[in-house]
Amino acid sequence: MGVILYQRLSMSLSEKIGLRLLTSLDPEKAHNLAIRALKLGIVSNTPVFKSKALELNVAGLKFNNPLGLAAGFDKNAEAIKPLMNFGFGFIEVGAVTPNAQKGNPKPRLFRLREDKAIINRFGFNNDGMIKVSKRLSRRPSNGIIGLNLGANKTSADRISDFATVFKTCKEFVDFATVNVSSPNTENLRELQAHKELRELLNKVMSCQNDSKIKVPIFLKIAPDLKKGELENIALVASETKIDGIIATNTTTSRYNLKSIYQHEQGGLSGVPIFETSTRVLAQLYSITDGQIPLIGVGGVFTGEQLFQKIRAGASLVQIYSALIYSGFSVTTKILKELDLTLKNHGFKNVEEAIGTGAKEWL
């Protein structure tokens, strides 16, 4: 009750009206309108919450806080500057493919209000690496920006696609993510298999050797993996010396959902995948002995849930669905709650809490 009251008080009247308007529209139209409003500067900012206890270093990068915006919200790097004003510790744009593509037929985005969830089957719709790289070249110098790498649906060589996008855009970003876990591009998840994954990551990592510009490379995996598959992924990650693993993408599973859209094809995100994605996170932390930085994603709406992800093994955590249901002020709310929760549990800073509760999820 207290959290709900705080959320209502912390949300401005304009944000309440804006959310009500957007949620009355078709989900994809609402999303596009939100991006346009951000670009035009007509979305009011919320006070940015800062605390020394939330600062940390991951993969050679210094983050003001561990809360990031997941890929998929700003697919084409159109609204980086206004998004940074909401207090995110980092933002990931994309996924971006070599050539522009329209993605899957509409409708392809569904709000599951009763479940506080979303199902999407976008299929890597984006403007292509050339247009996106030009936008990234004009990004603000402050803040940490990552790029989610994708492959074209009709590509004859998807492994080369990832490397091509990386080479084209890497000088403009602070990290890059190899996304082989989207369920909306046919056969993409097959690249998570040991042999294919090693070939892919070696190809992308080799681009680092050919250039003076080196940025951390992360791998984004699916939540629908068994322990043996996670062990293989951890082994390949260690062999190829990538800088981190993002766990997890959306799921193809359905968890006793209430919405009429529950049977729509696509990837499910939001509250229903919190436990599954957090368990995968904890398994990876255990398998890797905490030696590979992990970025948690899936179902985080509160500071307490962010804290649970961190205790399960995440150094950083990303959100998306929370913005759809709670607005941009949710970032400040979550960070304030995390700061207080750390203190209440006796942690001096966020780094002290990483992985301390991983065993509870195994």
Give names to the regions the model predicted.
Residues 26, 69, 91, 132, ...:
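Conserved, mostly hydrophobic/aromatic
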Residues 35-49, 182-196, 235-290:
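Glycine/Thr-rich beta-alpha phosphate-binding loop at enzyme active sites
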Residues 62-68, 141-149, 210-225, 286-296:
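Short beta-strand/loop segments at the ligand-binding rim of alpha/beta enzyme cores
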Residues 78-83, 163, 225-239, 286, ...:
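Catalytic cores of alpha/beta
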Residues 92-101, 180-182, 244-252, 306-333:
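Glycine-rich phosphate-binding active-site loops on the catalytic face of alpha/beta enzymes
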Residues 94, 99-142:
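A gly/proline- and charged-residue-enriched helix-loop-helix capping module
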Residues 100-116, 256-269, 324-347:
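C-terminal helical cap(s) of enzyme catalytic domains, especially alpha/beta-barrels
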